[in-house]
Structure formats: structure tokens, C-alpha cells
Amino acid sequence: LFLHDRLLNAAIQGLVDIKKYSETTPGMISFVGLPYEMNGKLYNVVAGIMNGCILGMVPKMYLPNYGEFYERRQFTPGFNECVYVDVDGEEVPFGSELLFTFNNNRKVKIGVEICEDLWTPQPPSIKHAMNGATIIVNASASNETIGKDTYRKQLVSGQSARLVCGYVYSSAGGGESTQDIVFSAHNLICENGSTLAEAHKFADESVYADIDVERICSERRRMSTYAVDENSTYTEVQAQNFINKELELIRYFDKAPFVPSDKKERDSRCEEILNIQSYGLKKRLEHTNCKNAVIGISGGLDSTLALLVTVRAFDLCGFDRSGIHCITMPCFGTTDRTYNNAVKLTKQLGCS
């Protein structure tokens, strides 16, 4: 069907219809996948649409031709160079190296890759991010096999972490009725390794989330190894009047982000913290051949943790706990309760 003029013309008409409808949703950018013919070759592309305009078209770079896939029968791999094509009387940029930017929010830069592009050793999203993209959009048609959903989620989440970006992954659903494979509409939104939203498989449901672009930019500034390409060959397509007003947050921000709410995970995190500190102290004790430690304790949280870490380190070294000397240091904030806690803790741990 991809080779039939009727389907190709209908796809263009559908794109034009969506373009016209976008005039009624000002400030919202949409990405639509379609087959597109250029110079006698057929490309698998995604078009960016906003405010009644087709902003650009990005071709798929990697075409799978293994297993249940045979895209090379019909399609031609995309290219990096930006050329211009006529779509409904508009001159539209076409090429892989496109970034969608906005005149009133320069931190939002969107790069596009398509399905298999993400599953390759060198996904285009790497270049997109190294050229400034803070959000990656992937319009996909990823079929279902046993266990593939778990791998897919790990792939999307991992890529968002590796690139320090937001990753919006939209996959085909039950509407693909003419295929000999099954699609589940496994839609995902991830940010820097965290999954913000995930659709239930086979539910054909939409997902949405708040992506913290300012956090992404802040994290990238902190990373001295995250260097943006200074000799960029990318074309930035600037859209006008991106939504830039305060909206009600739909994202939940944990008041204690470093303390897991799940007890099992919280216990594991606490054990990890204790081990990191204890093994660090163990190394220092062995290096200095020191078998004594002096700790000021008050019965409060900080000194209690310091004591527990020291006890664990002494046990790891095989040292006698009597070498840990606990000194109470009462002050204006000390109460009978905290003082007694400090004394009891010292005795029960077998310290001096």
C-alpha cells in the first residue's frame, strides 16, 4: 500500500487537515508520522505542526530489515542535510538535523527520531542532544512480543538519563489493523531516567506529564563532560508563541525526594548509605593503622549516625568496639531525654 499514489496523496491530505486544525490550538506543537515521496524515493517521516504551519519534516534514518520488519522494501533511509520541499504551498525544511525551537522559550528545543532509530548503537537523539535538544520526540510503531515492553521502557528511560533530556515516546496502537503484528500503544514520557507517565498497554490511552526543562538545563551545566557541538550543522526551525504562561502543575513533586516511600526500598537505601560511609571509614582506619576513634555524641540524629557508621567500620576491620570512645557534650539544647539516649546507645553498642 505504501507504493500506491492513493495512499500517499491521502497521507498528505491528512497532514494538511491537521495543519488547518492546529490553527484552533494556538501554542501547541504536534508531531505526525506519514510516508512521504520526494524525488522518486519514499521516506518514513515525522512532521512538526504548529499554529497552522508545517514547521519541518524529519526522515527516519535507520530502517529495520530483520525479523518481522522489512521497511527497506519500500522506504529509503533519511539524510542529515536540510533541503526544502513544497507541502500545500509551504516551503518546508526536510532533513534529520532539525531542531524545533520557540521564540519565547529558548530552553525548549525538540529533536525527533523515529522508532528503530532509538534501538541502534548510535541513535540520532545523541546528536540532537549534543546540539542542544532538551526534549526528544519519538513517533514509533513498536510491535509487541513477550517481554518487549520492559526492554522498551528501560531503553526510553535510559536514553533520557544518558542524554539528560525529556523523552516523549508515542507508539502505534490498535488502529494498525492491516498489519500482521500487534501494537499496544505503549506510550511513555521520561525525564533524566525517571518515568513520568506510562500508558496501559492495549488501552489506546493518551498520557501527559510536566517536563522540567529548567532542571534539564541546570543538570547539563553541572556536567563538565556535557559539551554542546560548537560546529553545529543543525537547522533550527523557530515557531512563534509557544505556550508560555503559568499552568497548574500535574506533576507530583515529593517533599522528601531522597527518602523512598516504599519501606523495602527505603531500607535498601539506608543500608547503602551506611555501607558507603562505613567502607570509606574502614579504608581510612586501615591506612592509618588506627584502632581508636573519639566521637562526640548528643543523642541527636547526626552523632547517632556517625556512631553507627564507626561501629560498622570497626566490625569490618575486626577491631574491638571498646576502641570507640563516646564523649557526651551537653549544651543548651541537651535534654535529659537526649542525654540518656546517648548513654544507652553507647552501652548497647559496646563502646567506651
Question: Which ranges hold each PLM region?
Answer:
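Enzyme catalytic cores with a strong preference for nitrogen-chemistry domains
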Residues: L1-G296, L307-L308, R312-R321, Q348
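ATP-dependent adenylation/pyrophosphate-handling site
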Residues: A293-I297, L301-V343
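Conserved adenosine/adenylate-binding substructure
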Residues: G111-E113, V343, S352
